[in-house]
Amino acid sequence: MAHPKRKISKTRRDKRRTHYKAVASQFVECSNCSAPVLLHIVCPECGHYRGKLAIEKALAV
């Protein structure tokens, strides 16, 4: 197996890892039903996307 030739300092290691970070999901409000929805995703509550009906939702009886 490969072995490092030199010790990598904590600073150098951490500088390499600066791009690995957690990013929070962006939520927006649905323009039709005001439910929180992920960006660029059809609303799971009403089926609308950008003001148009994208998915026919079955009515709950």
UniProtKB/Swiss-Prot annotation:
Q: Which Pfam families match?
A: Ribosomal_L32p
Q: Record's Gene Ontology CC terms?
A: large ribosomal subunit
Q: So which residues are the signal peptide here?
A: none
Keywords attached to this entry: Ribonucleoprotein, Ribosomal protein
Which Gene Ontology MF annotations are present? structural constituent of ribosome
| GO BP annotations listed | translation
InterPro entries in alphabetical order: Ribosomal_bL32, Ribosomal_bL32_bact, Ribosomal_zn-bd
Family assignment from sequence similarity: Belongs to the bacterial ribosomal protein bL32 family.
Name listed for the protein in its UniProt record: Large ribosomal subunit protein bL32
- Which gene is annotated as encoding this protein in its UniProt record? rpmF
